[in-house]
Amino acid sequence: MSIRILPENEIKPSASAFEIPPLLFANPKNLYTRRAKRLRELAKNNPLRDYLEFAAHLVDIQLTLLETAPIGNYAEKLTAYLTENQGQKPLNKQQFARDEKWLELLLALIKQCKPYATGAILTTLEFLEKASYAELNNLADHLLNERYEQVSPDQSVFIWLALSLYWTQLAQQLPRHTQAEIGERHTCPVCGSAPITSVIHLDKTQGLRYLHCALCESEWNMTRAQCSNCDESGDLNYWSFDTVEAPIKAESCGDCHSYLKVLYQEKDPYVEPLADDLASLMLDIEMEQKGFVRSGLNPFLFSIE
């Protein structure tokens, strides 16, 4: 799946196509506020409490940087690029020519995190702070091209959070009269990243499934009861530690032997992709013991995956 800008004469005639919105863009301020709050709520009585609270603090920093150091206006540049490259993923993580703004975000994130860091985390931050722009861009290239093993897990978290803050703001500036093209739906139609989880929505999109991007935070629609990794539907199963009413389940596929978590807003309206995925790590361990491979990506799990 990719997206294209609709010509003016197609916007009104195509209104019926948006009864099921194929693509939802994030509201970064609301997203980071909600995510940090959810992480702190889930930290209570969770064996990963310290890590969840650490993650919440980093999300707080993302929100602060969003408000105090925005990337600026890229809208005209993005519109021109989209017009010339119809049907392509506009912010393709492997091809989009990022500028130094993401590096400024990374260094600002490090600066705000250092006063609270100790031990190995402080060592990691100091290494990244002293690295050259060329070295940092090389590490980012590895992550964006899915060569995760080439980057230290401790470094990956901070680099990805800066990249995500950059990409999310870029996605926010894409023209809103865009339409998703039918095609491959396994990765984000905006940037090509893997999803964190899928979410079954409430409200205007009630009952619809959307996959939540791990990089630009956009969401794209995908049919339920269909594997988000291989499109097969004949051997899907749903797993949880609780009851059939659990708000978090793992959807496994017997055809490709992958799994992706599904969050149900009707069971818990406060579920949040990154936070709930991270807090339910024990479900990942259980799924891997059953022989399934995780198809989703969570930046806070680089050190575990």
UniProtKB/Swiss-Prot annotation:
Annotated GO biological process: protein maturation
Family classification: Belongs to the FdhE family.
Pfam families referenced in this protein's UniProt entry, alphabetically: FdhE_C (PF24860), FdhE_central (PF24859), FdhE_N (PF04216)
Record key words, sorted: Cytoplasm
SUPFAM superfamilies: FdhE-like (SSF144020)
Record's function text: Necessary for formate dehydrogenase activity.
GO CC annotations, alphabetized: cytosol
Annotated localization: Cytoplasm
Molecular functions (GO terms): ferric iron binding
Protein name as it appears in the record: Protein FdhE homolog
HAMAP family: FdeH (MF_00611)
UniProt xrefs under PANTHER family: PROTEIN FDHE
